Amino acid sequence: VSIDLFDSLPAPYGLIRYGVAPDHPRIKGIVNSLHEMLDSGKIRFFGNVLFGKDLTLEDIKRHYHAVIFATGAIKDAKLNIPGVDLDGSYGAADFVSWYDGHPDVPRTWPLTAEKVAVLGNGNVALDVARVLAKQADDMLSTDIPENVYQGLKASPVTDVHVFGRRGPADIKFTPIELRELGEVEDVEIVLYPE
């Protein structure tokens, strides 16, 4: 069996590379296992290939017996709440892509507010809050891109509040994520039952 892997990005590993917080080296360590698979010779990687432009379904069908579309989930859910489109309101997917150095997002991020509200009940919401709440220097031991480090260092953010859109029974974050957020210097976790 041989596998050809096409990606619109120049480097492989998708959301593991561009969707995991830089201070989570254990999860990012999966890249090493994937790298071994790519080096095995059974999988070939072709980067910078745009499906529909550089490669069509007809092209693929002519050369392959099976096709699997594995596109990831790098889009934000559309929130139907007032103010979601105001200046200063951003989706987590773009922010995560920025702090992970995704090549398709701007190198600078408008971190101009002192107080930030993060809406969400999942791990990504807590990752975003943790990255914003940490001192930039605490991220130096990670693989954080230099431009992101500089952006966080210059950031005026002093208060980060996480708001869940549903009740406590609907939380999606893991206890590990909550504990990691609570271990950040000067972070106080307050949970409201309603």
Language-model segment annotations:
Residues 76-156:
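Glycine-rich dinucleotide-binding loop and its adjacent helix/turn
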Residues 62-72, 117-119:
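Short hydrophobic core segments
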